[in-house]
Amino acid sequence: MPSVRVKENEPFEVAMRRFKRSIEKTGLLTELRAREFYEKPTTERKRKKAAAVKRHYKRLRSQMLPPKLY
């Protein structure tokens, strides 16, 4: 669990921003949203496979040479 110690004479907003940043770095919020509802194992596998395919095509697209415009 991320924790933030409020420094002396530090505004609350700054401490809150540091806390939000630390939670974002650990990935706690994304995991919480993923675990909010039960996901069947088949659905989870299907979603992960679709994400892998999307990443693969994105990587291929970035490696392709741009078309010549002349």
Curated annotation (Swiss-Prot):
Give me any GO biological process, just one: translation
- The question of whether Methyltransferase is a record keyword is answered with no
Keywords noted in UniProt: Ribonucleoprotein, Ribosomal protein
Keyword Glycoprotein in record: no
List the GO molecular function terms: structural constituent of ribosome
Pfam families xrefs: Ribosomal_S21
GO cellular component entries: ribonucleoprotein complex; ribosome
Q: Which InterPro entries match?
A: Ribosomal_bS21, Ribosomal_bS21_sf
Which family would the database say this protein is a member of?
Belongs to the bacterial ribosomal protein bS21 family.
- HAMAP family (UniProt xref): Ribosomal_bS21
Protein name, as recorded: Small ribosomal subunit protein bS21
In the UniProt record, the gene name given for this protein reads rpsU
